Design a protein with these regions (language model features):
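A membrane-interface helix-boundary motif in multi-pass transporters
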Residues: 2-3, 172-212
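Helix-to-loop junctions at the C-terminal end of transmembrane segments
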Residues: 20-22, 67-80
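Multi-pass alpha-helical transporter architecture, strongest
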Residues: 21, 100, 195-239
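C-terminal transmembrane helical hairpin of 12-TM major facilitator-type secondary transporters
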Residues: 47, 52, 58-61, 81-135
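Residue-level signature of mid-helix packing/kink "hotspots" within the transmembrane helices
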Residues: 61-69, 160, 164
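Intracellular helix-loop hinge segments at the cytoplasmic ends of transmembrane helices
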Residues: 136-142, 171
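A late C-terminal transmembrane helix in Major Facilitator Superfamily
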Residues: 145-179
Length: 240
């Protein structure tokens, strides 16, 4: 029952955040934003009361669902796509390093650890909104219109390679940095459930932070190229 209620709250947050972009009435915009924020808080509180890891991870897409339409409207009307890409990359780095080094310091803290986990996962969701909301509208400005379909296909091709490859790499890094856990699991000293909470996830998280660093470098390069060649990445899509 609680899970169904949380799903309903998620739909309310998504709907109100999306509708926020398509109304010009200030009072209605404020009401929609308030409903979205209150729904998000209630969702997090219900997850905290359940004290389960999946409820924390379930928050990950929730803020992304809420703010992606808003960020898309910002890019359309204000521009700054390359800057948003860089900012999203910085948030990716900070969040993964927080999970790797700061969150373990609060192990055993029922309030502090859960609070940091929720805040970090929400910010991580926001970073996942910043990157696509700025990346996709920028593609037509970077490639010839005749090959724009191929450009999008190439992006998704590379993305799917990453979705296939990096879970394998993370698993390999996890095994190589936790040989004792792997041996205990192989010798049936511990169960897979016990192994999952015994692994040290520091290095896989550092690896993901490095990917954020690579994205930040690419963002800096794009902003530099845009400044030199005038591609219009920082300009709004809607010209007055």
């Amino acid at each position: 029952t609680v899970t169904i209620i949380q799903y309903c709250i998620m739909l309310v947050v998504a709907a109100t955040a999306f509708a926020f972009n398509f109304t010009s009435k200030k009072a209605l915009k404020t009401l929609l934003l308030a409903i979205s924020v209150i729904g998000l808080i209630i969702f997090c509180y219900m997850g905290y009361m359940r004290q389960s890891a999946e409820t924390i991870f379930a928050v990950f897409p929730l803020l992304a669902v809420g703010i992606t339409p808003i960020l898309g409207k910002v890019v359309d009307n204000k521009g700054k796509a390359a800057t948003m890409l860089m900012f999203g990359s910085i948030l990716l780095i900070v969040c993964h390093l927080t999970f790797a080094f700061i969150l373990p310091l609060f192990k055993g803290s029922a309030i502090g650890g859960v609070l940091i986990a929720y805040v970090t996962i929400l910010i991580l969701g926001a970073s996942f909104s910043l990157v696509p909301a700025s990346l996709w509208p920028s593609v037509p400005k970077l490639v010839d219109q005749r090959v724009i379909g191929s450009a999008y296909a190439l992006i998704f091709w590379i993305q799917n390679i990453g979705l296939w490859l990096f879970p394998l790499l993370i698993g390999k890094v996890l095994d190589n940095t936790n040989p004792q856990v792997v041996n205990d699991l192989k010798n049936h000293v511990i169960t897979p459930e016990q192994a999952a909470v015994s692994y040290d996830y520091t290095w896989p998280l550092v690896m993901l932070a490095c990917l954020g660093g690579a994205a930040l470098v690419i963002g800096v390069i794009l902003k530099r190229v845009d400044k030199v060649k005038g591609l219009g990445l920082e300009l709004p899509n809607v010209q007055q």
